[in-house]
Amino acid sequence: MSTDQKDRIIAGGEELFMQAGIKSVTMDDIARHLGMSKKTLYQFFSDKNELVIALIKKNLNKDECQIHQIIETSGNVIEEMINMMKCSEEIYSRINPIVIHDIQKYHPDAWKEFQNFKADVLINTLEQLLKKGIEQGFIRPDLDVKILAKMRLNQVEMGFNTSIFPVTEFSPWKVQYQLLEHFNYGICTLSGHELLDQYKNAVTSISN
């Protein structure tokens, strides 16, 4: 079976999910959106749940590659943090919080994929970043990196909780940015603050 066609179905499903949430989108909707028969759709995915799991896995693999690229190309831990912020802006600005809610409530297997990724990749990567920052003198040495790494990842989930931050009142990206900036400045030493300000000012002047 064609990998290109499978990827096209995943991309088409993601497009509709981001617009309307997962629960309200049917396999009929996806087939119609892609201009293909539902029979063709079911050649690749037995049901919507399987499609959602495939979509989550694809995006998590992409996120892991981006994280590794940022680590490899950044000169120090503060530059990593700034580049992570820019990467996060791209991701969070297109995420519909309803999608997060639907995955948690209706697709537990897909949500488990994310939880495993968080435990195996994200928390470990953040712990290593914090340790490296302490060695470089930019992150406060009094921090417990395990606690801070877990706290940060749960902050992200909280930011997408629509019962706390209703989408009618809050921009998901602005919420995530505020939480991330609060975290970054909270963990930095004075020299870390200075470098963080330098990078932020440079990014702001480029964007203007």
Per-range role (PLM):
Residues 93-127, 134-138, 146-147:
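Short secondary-structure transition hinges
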Residues 1-20, 24-36, 50-53:
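Basic, helix-initiating cap at the start of DNA-binding domains
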